[in-house]
A protein has these predicted regions:
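Hinge/lid segment of periplasmic solute-binding proteins
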Residues: 110-162, 307-309, 377
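A structural signal for short loop-to-beta-strand junctions that line the ligand-binding cleft
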Residues: 103-104, 133-171, 318-320, 394-404
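Extracytoplasmic/periplasmic solute-binding protein
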Residues: 154-158, 163, 187-241, 285
Length: 445
């Protein structure tokens, strides 16, 4: 629905407030944060901000400590925080957006940017970025653009994530599979799964250990597979970037490996919704695709022999890319845009906040903060930081624009369609045709 004139005036007035406040606020912030002292100039007395995010207990504890430091630096500003698990958070945020307004500052998923920007729930941040109220000089420009919608900045990345492959190095060595490198191929990955299954290793309960989870359900991995071939998920906000033949080939590849017994059985894949419930987490598979942020859960569960490897390639071309693990946005209906953007800047750029938050949201997008915090990392967290550096040197294509509205529904539809393939209810070709028909309807609605 087109934005009303009153809605446009409201957004434009908030832009004017941000622009007018930017220079003075930015100067006051810089002085305050550099001197580690309080300054009443950067806030109005008696202001309460709301700030929400999703994540585990460790992330919650660290975030609250960083927020407490912000409050100390901004007398008169109180930040009321709330957090939940991912699913509950997404439902609540959608309800808030439909009911008149999201929190003053909200943690956002990459897949939500188009939905909430186009729906008028987020405040444009271009002036805040341009005038340095939200400082972005230490962020990669292409990565910063992942928070844009139709050319305007609506959110700023809070973490830089990348897909990878958690694998049991002892099992790989036992099967004679070399350590995966950034240029290993999908064919080599498939052969590795076959070799591991052929070992006949037994999982708890006496079942044979397979090579990996069946990632035909995983749209993120399909995207990596597509990008490695020069393709993409979306050609535009209303059009898919791949064909029925592309998806049929991918699902046939996955389906064949499952039928061979090289990857997990359908029921094991269907119930995988966490590290602990995945085939690898249950000891039924030697590897699994995952994002860097949750990767440390695998060695914590299974032991230090679990390492993080690159996603396979097509002829050496990597399809993985640096994606915002999450972003920060400001609610369009906030009554305190200056203080809200100040909180965003503080969480992204203050060294003390960086020390507190660490890598709880994956690699900090501020290069200086990331390098500073990396010096203290150990174990799995240090490994994912080194992995990101290695992949950056190998060479990755730029990240795509934020997915279009409807992408969240399509991710669910993608998994549902492949479930039918897994349970032999339809063929890869027919499932691909049905999914593309549904996707086209969703994107055009």
């Amino acid at each position: 629905m087109p934005e009303s004139r009153s809605g446009r005036r409201r957004l434009h007035s908030r832009r004017a407030v941000l622009a007018a406040a930017a220079v003075g606020l930015g100067t006051a912030l810089t002085a305050s944060l550099s001197a580690c002292s309080s300054s009443g100039d950067v806030s109005s007395e008696g202001i309460t901000l709301t700030f929400s995010w999703w994540g585990n207990d460790d992330r919650a504890e660290r975030t609250k400590k960083a927020v407490a430091l912000f409050e100390q630096e901004h007398p008169g500003v109180t930040v009321r925080t709330s957090n939940a698990d991912f699913g509950s958070y997404m439902q609540k945020l959608a309800t808030q957006a439909a009911g008149g307004g999201i929190p003053d500052v909200a943690q956002l998923d990459y897949r939500q940017i188009s939905q909430y920007s186009g729906g008028g729930a987020l405040l444009p941040l271009d002036e805040a970025v341009e005038h340095g109220t939200i400082r972005t000089s230490e962020m990669d420009e292409e990565f910063l653009r992942t928070g844009t919608y139709e050319g305007e900045q609506y959110a700023v990345p809070m973490g830089r994530g990348i897909t990878g492959y958690a694998y049991d190095s002892k099992v790989y060595a036992q099967a004679g599979v070399p350590t995966p490198q950034p240029d290993w191929t999908w064919e080599e990955w498939a052969d590795a799964n076959r070799k591991i299954a052929a070992l006949g290793l037994k999982a708890p309960g006496g079942r044979t250990v397979v090579g990996a989870n069946d990632n035909g359900v995983n749209e993120d991995i399909f995207e990596d597979w597509l990008r490695g071939r020069g393709g993409k998920l979306y050609a535009s906000r209303t059009k898919l970037g791949f064909t029925e033949d592309d998806l049929t080939e991918f699902w046939t590849f996955c389906d064949t490996l499952r039928e061979e017994g090289a990857v997990a059985e359908a029921p094991d894949t269907a119930q995988a919704n966490s590290t602990e419930t995945s085939p690898m987490g249950r000891g039924l598979a030697a590897a699994d695709f995952t994002w860097d942020a949750p990767f440390p859960g695998y060695p914590a569960l299974l032991g230090d022999q679990v390492h993080f490897a690159p996603v396979p390639t097509t002829d050496g071309r990597q399809g993985a890319y640096f994606k915002p693990s999450m972003l920060l946005g400001v609610g369009a209906h906030t009554d305190h845009p200056e203080e809200a953007t100040a909180l965003v800047d503080f969480l992204l750029n203050d060294e003390r906040a960086g020390d507190i938050l660490g890598f709880t949201r994956s690699t900090p997008p501020n290069r200086r903060i990331a390098a500073r915090v990396a010096k203290t990392l150990q174990g799995a967290e240090r490994e994912i930081y080194q992995y990101a550096q290695k992949m950056e040197k190998y060479g990755l294509d730029a990240p795509p624009a934020a997915p279009p509205r409807g992408d969240v529904a399509l991710q669910t539809a993608f998994k549902r369609a492949y479930h039918r393939v897994m349970y032999d209810l339809t063929s890869p070709r027919e499932a691909a045709r049905e999914f593309i028909d549904e996707a086209n309807r969703e994107l055009r609605s």
